[in-house]
């Protein structure tokens, strides 16, 4: 398979403590995967400047095609993503006019004064661009560095989703010429451990992702959801998935499995 790697960085004490479920990383992962990227790593760090700098630097050093972060762009003392990204890139924060105008317009429309805390959201790393946030105040941050698309999004899910789409539609440079496709088989009466050697051989033979997801207890009434997925040229990956699916169906029949249309 061809790979266009991506990484996700989630910033927030509330995620690490378990108070907030990391649905942002799940959404970003699904969206990037749908574009043909392979998400190689998701990193979660606390609202600490050194941790944020380290997370960005390490991700950049691995040279993925795209890095997307969520969280830490707001007006409070513990919103440190812009500063952390700037330090990771070796640049200063600067008042970004586009970001400032976006923020000023939103507060002015509501007759709310622009305090220093609100103005803080307009400071971006030098060379970065503001990404429109149509669902909130803090703009996203985009910078193209060492052939890597880097995007920082707010932590509020609806804002993150909006900023991510604006980035994909208007700014993303590294666009895979690949297609991500997947198919599923649902089967009863086959234990995951019994199917495992067949899966292992097919992964080796076709260089494709096959994952068995158990939906019940193996020793009582085994039910499996089998995922077959890959990225590549659309026609090539379609053919490969179909071949794998047919060979898996043959293996399931040998094991006296029962194919279902869904779970």
UniProtKB/Swiss-Prot annotation:
Signal peptide: none annotated. It comes from the Archaea. InterPro entries: CinA, CinA_Arc, MoaB/Mog-like_dom_sf, MoaB/Mog_dom. This is Protein LS215_2186. Disulfide bonds: none annotated. It comes from Saccharolobus islandicus (strain L.S.2.15 / Lassen #1). It holds the Pfam family MoCF_biosynth. Belongs to the CinA family. Gene3D superfamilies: MoaB/Mog-like domain.
């Amino acid at each position: 398979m061809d790979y266009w790697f991506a990484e996700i960085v989630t910033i927030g004490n509330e995620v690490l403590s378990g108070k907030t479920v990391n649905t942002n990383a799940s959404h970003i992962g699904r969206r990037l995967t749908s574009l043909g990227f392979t998400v190689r790593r998701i990193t979660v760090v606390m609202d600490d400047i050194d941790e944020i700098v380290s997370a960005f630097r390490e991700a950049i050093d691995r040279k993925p095609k795209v890095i997307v972060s969520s969280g830490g762009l707001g007006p409070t003392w513990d919103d440190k993503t812009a500063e952390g990204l700037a330090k990771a890139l070796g640049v200063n924060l600067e008042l970004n006019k586009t970001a400032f105008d976006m923020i000023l317009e939103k507060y002015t429309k509501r007759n709310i004064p622009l305090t220093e805390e609100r103005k803080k959201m307009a400071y971006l790393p030098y060379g970065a661009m503001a990404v429109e946030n149509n669902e909130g105040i803090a703009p996203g941050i985009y910078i193209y560095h060492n052939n890597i698309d880097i995007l920082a999004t707010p932590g509020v899910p609806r804002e993150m989703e909006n900023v991510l789409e604006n980035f994909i539609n208007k700014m993303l440079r590294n666009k895979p010429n690949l297609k991500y496709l997947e198919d599923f088989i649902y089967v009863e009466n086959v234990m995951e451990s019994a199917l495992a050697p067949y899966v292992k051989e097919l992964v080796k033979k076709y260089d494709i992702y096959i994952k068995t997801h158990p939906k019940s207890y193996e020793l009582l009434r085994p039910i499996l959801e089998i995922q077959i997925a890959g990225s590549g040229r659309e026609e090539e990956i379609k053919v490969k998935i179909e071949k794998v699916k047919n060979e898996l169906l043959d293996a399931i029949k040998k094991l006296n499995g029962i194919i279902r249309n869904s779970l």
